C-alpha cells in the first residue's frame, strides 16, 4: 500500500468518525426536542381537561346560584313580584294633535313627552327639533309603599318592576292605556292613563292618571301615607340660558288659594318642605310646564331643584317627594298631568275634578297685583284679539304701542302745557332765585314759588304725572314680553325670536355686564332714549328740579339701559323704541299747536281769578304751616346767633 493510499484511508476514517459523532449529537438534540413537545402536548391536554371541568363546574355553580337567587327572590317578594323584576319591558305610544306620550311598562310610567307644535331654538331655518318635556334618561316616577312579609314589612318601589299591559285602546275621543303589577294572587296595582283628543288645548294637553289598589288591603302593611318620587331634568329650549333659567323654577298651589307659590327664580338650588296639603306641583320653565295635579290633594310635599351648568344642555333638575294619604279602605287615587305651554288662554281653562278653578294660569309670572291685573285684563286680551287678524307680532306691538299712547295722550298734553307754563314764568322764577340766594331763605323761596305756581295755575307735579301713570304699564310689559309664548319663535325684521334677544353681531369675547353679542333693537332703543331725554330736558329745563340732572338723565340712564336690556327680549326693546319715538312725535305736534303768548294770556286771566277767589281750607292750612316753619327757622337763627 503506497503512501497516498494510506493517507486517503486515514482521511476517510476521520471523516466517517466525525460524521458519526455529529449525527449522534443531532439525534440526541432531536430526541430531547420530541420529548419536550410531547410533554407540552400532554400538559396542554391536561390543562384543557382541567379548564373544561372548571367551566362545567362554574356553569353548574352559576345555574345553582341563579336558581338559589331566584329562590331567594321568590322567597322575599313572592312568585309574582319576583317574575315582575325579571320580565322584559314593553313600550307604547299615545298621541293627539298637541303632544305625543311614550310609555314603558318598566315602572308603568311615561317615558317621554313631546310637544308636537313647538320646536327648540335653532338659528334661522334649522328650527326643527321638537320640544321634549320628559325623557327617560332624566326623568323618574316611583310609587313606594310597604307590604306585609311575615313579621316584617317589605318596601316596594314600582320603578323596579315591569307591569303588564294589553296596549292602548281608543274609546271615542280618548285613548286609554292600562298597566298593572300583580303583587299576589288576585291582588294587583293598576295604573290607568287617559289622553284626550277633543280639539281643545285645555283638555288635550292634560293626561288623566288613576292609581287603583285592587285587593291589596289584606297584604298592605300599616302605613298612613304612600310616597311618590317625581323627578325630571329640563332641557334648554331657548337661545339664552340666563333668561330661561331666570324664569325656570318649581311652583306649587295650596288648596283654595288664588295665588301660586314658587321656590324662587335664578337660584342655584332651593328646597322646601310643605307639611300641609298641596293641590298641585309644577316643574315650570320659561314657556312650558309639567304639572302634577292631585284631585284630592297631596298630604305633604318635599321638593327642590338645582341649576345645571350653562353648557350642559339642561336648565334645572327637579325633584318632588309627594305623600298620598292611605288607610285600609283606600282603593283609588286620581290625578292629572298638564304637559304643555305656559299660555294664559289654555291654563286659565284648566280646572279641577269638580270644575273649580285651580289657579293654573298663575304659573305665568305676569307680576303683582296692579301689574298682573293690567297684563291679564288688557295686554293679553288685546294681543289675542289682534293676533286673530294680524299675522305679524311686530305689527301687533306697534298697534299696541299706538293704543297705549292714545290712551294717555290727555296726560301727555297736560304735561306739555305744564312744561310750557314753566317756560313762560322762567324769568319770574329766576328773579325769585336772585331774591332769595341764601340757604336760610329756602322756606321763603319755596313759599314764593308756590304762590307763583298758584297764580299761574301750574301743578308742580303736572310734568311728572304722565310718567308716573306709565310706570305700571311699562313694568307690566317688562314682565309680559319675556314670558309671552305668543312671541316665541315669532320673527320680525332681523329678529329671529321676539321673545329673546336679537343678535346682529356675536362677539368672540364677553363684555362684563353687557354680554357676548350685540342686540340691534337694544342699540336703537338706547339711541332713542338719548334723543328723547335731550328733547325732554330741553323742554323741562325751566323746572328748578331739573337743574344738574342733564348728565344723569340724558346720558347715564340710556347707557345703563343699554347694558341691562342687551340680553332681554327683542320685542320688549322694540316696544320701548316705539314708545319713545311716538312720544317725541306727539310732543313735537303739540308744540306746533301751542302758542306761548296764548298761554301767558291764559295765565294772566287765571291770576286775576285767583285774586278774587276765596282760599280753600287746605290752602289756608298750608300757608299757616309755611308761616310756622318760617318762624321756627327764624327763632333757630336767633338762638344760633346768641351762642356765637
Q: Where is each model-derived feature located?
A:
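Membrane-protein biogenesis/insertion across secretory and organellar systems
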Residues: 1-406, 600-644
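Transmembrane helix interruption/hinge and helix-loop junction motifs
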Residues: 3, 390-393, 563-573
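Core hydrophobic alpha-helical membrane-spanning segments
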Residues: 8-21, 474-477, 523-528, 559-560
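Residue-level signal for the membrane-embedded core of alpha-helical transmembrane segments
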Residues: 13, 394, 398, 468, ...
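Membrane-interface amphipathic helices and adjacent TM-edge segments
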Residues: 26, 407-474, 530-565, 581-641
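Transmembrane alpha-helical segments that form the functional core of multipass membrane systems
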Residues: 362-435, 444, 450, 454, ...
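Membrane-interface starts of transmembrane alpha-helices
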Residues: 390-400, 517-521, 549-553
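Conserved catalytic motifs of ABC-family nucleotide-binding domains
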Residues: 476-530
Amino acid at each position: 500500500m503506497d503512501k497516498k493510499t494510506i493517507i486517503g484511508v486515514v482521511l476517510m476514517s476521520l471523516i466517517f468518525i466525525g460524521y458519526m459523532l455529529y449525527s449522534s449529537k443531532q439525534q440526541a438534540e432531536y430526541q430531547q426536542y420530541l420529548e419536550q413537545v410531547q410533554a407540552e402536548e400532554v400538559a396542554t391536554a391536561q390543562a384543557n381537561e382541567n379548564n373544561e371541568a372548571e367551566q362545567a363546574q362554574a356553569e353548574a355553580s352559576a345555574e345553582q346560584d341563579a336558581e338559589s337567587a331566584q329562590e331567594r327572590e321568590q322567597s322575599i317578594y313572592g312568585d309574582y313580584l319576583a317574575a315582575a323584576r325579571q320580565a322584559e319591558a314593553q313600550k307604547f305610544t299615545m298621541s293627539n294633535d298637541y303632544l305625543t306620550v311614550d310609555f314603558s311598562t318598566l315602572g308603568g310610567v311615561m317615558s317621554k313627552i313631546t310637544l308636537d307644535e313647538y320646536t327648540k331654538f335653532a338659528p334661522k331655518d334649522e328650527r326643527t327639533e321638537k320640544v321634549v318635556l320628559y325623557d327617560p334618561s332624566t326623568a323618574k316616577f316611583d310609587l313606594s309603599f310597604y307590604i306585609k312579609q311575615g313579621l316584617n314589612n317589605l318596601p316596594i318601589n314600582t320603578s323596579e318592576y315591569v307591569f303588564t299591559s294589553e296596549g292602548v285602546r281608543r274609546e271615542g275621543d280618548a285613548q286609554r292605556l292600562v298597566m298593572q303589577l300583580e303583587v299576589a294572587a288576585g291582588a294587583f296595582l293598576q295604573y290607568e292613563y287617559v289622553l284626550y283628543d277633543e280639539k281643545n288645548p285645555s283638555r288635550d294637553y292634560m293626561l288623566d292618571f288613576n292609581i287603583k289598589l285592587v285587593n291589596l288591603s289584606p297584604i298592605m302593611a300599616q302605613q298612613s301615607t304612600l310616597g311618590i318620587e317625581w323627578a325630571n331634568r329640563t332641557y334648554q329650549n331657548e337661545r339664552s340660558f340666563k333668561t330661561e333659567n331666570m324664569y325656570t323654577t318649581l311652583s306649587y298651589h295650596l288648596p283654595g288659594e288664588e295665588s301660586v307659590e314658587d321656590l324662587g327664580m335664578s337660584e342655584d338650588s332651593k328646597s322646601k318642605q310643605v307639611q300641609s296639603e298641596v293641590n298641585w306641583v309644577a316643574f315650570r320653565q320659561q314657556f312650558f310646564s309639567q304639572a302634577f295635579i292631585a284631585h284630592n290633594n297631596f298630604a305633604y310635599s318635599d321638593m327642590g331643584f338645582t341649576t345645571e351648568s350653562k353648557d350642559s344642555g339642561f336648565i334645572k333638575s327637579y325633584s318632588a317627594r309627594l305623600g298620598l294619604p292611605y288607610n285600609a279602605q283606600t282603593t283609588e287615587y286620581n290625578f292629572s298631568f298638564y304637559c304643555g305651554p305656559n299660555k294664559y288662554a289654555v291654563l286659565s281653562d284648566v280646572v279641577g275634578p269638580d270644575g273649580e278653578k285651580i289657579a293654573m294660569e298663575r304659573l305665568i309670572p305676569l307680576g303683582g297685583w296692579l301689574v298682573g291685573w293690567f297684563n291679564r285684563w288688557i295686554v293679553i286680551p288685546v294681543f289675542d284679539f289682534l293676533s286673530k287678524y294680524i299675522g305679524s307680532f311686530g305689527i301687533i306691538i306697534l298697534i299696541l304701542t299706538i293704543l297705549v299712547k292714545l290712551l294717555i295722550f290727555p296726560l301727555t298734553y297736560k304735561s306739555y302745557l305744564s312744561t310750557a307754563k314753566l317756560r313762560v314764568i322762567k324769568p319770574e322764577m329766576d328773579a325769585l332765585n336772585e331774591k332769595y340766594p341764601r340757604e336760610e331763605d329756602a322756606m321763603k323761596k319755596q313759599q314764593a314759588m308756590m304762590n307763583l305756581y298758584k297764580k299761574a295755575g301750574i301743578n308742580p307735579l303736572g310734568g311728572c304725572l304722565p310718567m308716573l301713570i306709565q310706570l305700571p304699564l311699562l313694568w307690566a310689559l317688562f314682565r309680559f314680553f319675556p314670558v309671552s309664548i305668543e312671541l316665541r319663535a315669532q320673527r320680525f325684521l332681523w329678529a329671529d325670536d321676539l321673545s329673546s334677544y336679537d343678535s346682529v353681531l356675536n362677539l368672540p369675547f364677553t363684555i362684563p355686564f353687557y354680554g357676548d353679542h350685540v342686540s340691534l333693537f337694544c342699540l336703537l332703543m338706547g339711541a332713542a332714549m338719548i334723543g328723547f331725554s335731550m328733547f325732554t330736558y330741553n323742554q323741562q329745563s325751566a323746572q328748578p328740579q331739573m337743574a344738574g340732572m342733564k348728565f344723569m338723565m340724558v346720558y347715564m340712564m340710556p347707557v345703563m339701559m343699554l347694558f341691562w336690556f342687551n340680553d332681554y327680549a327683542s320685542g320688549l326693546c322694540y316696544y320701548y323704541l316705539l314708545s319713545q319715538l311716538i312720544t317725541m312725535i306727539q310732543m313735537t305736534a303739540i308744540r306746533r299747536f301751542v302758542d306761548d303768548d296764548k298761554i301767558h294770556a291764559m295765565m294772566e286771566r287765571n291770576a286775576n281769578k285767583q285774586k278774587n277767589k276765596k282760599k280753600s281750607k287746605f290752602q289756608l292750612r298750608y300757608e299757616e304751616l309755611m308761616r310756622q316753619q318760617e318762624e321756627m327757622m327764624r327763632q333757630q337763627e336767633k338762638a344760633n346767633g346768641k351762642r356765637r
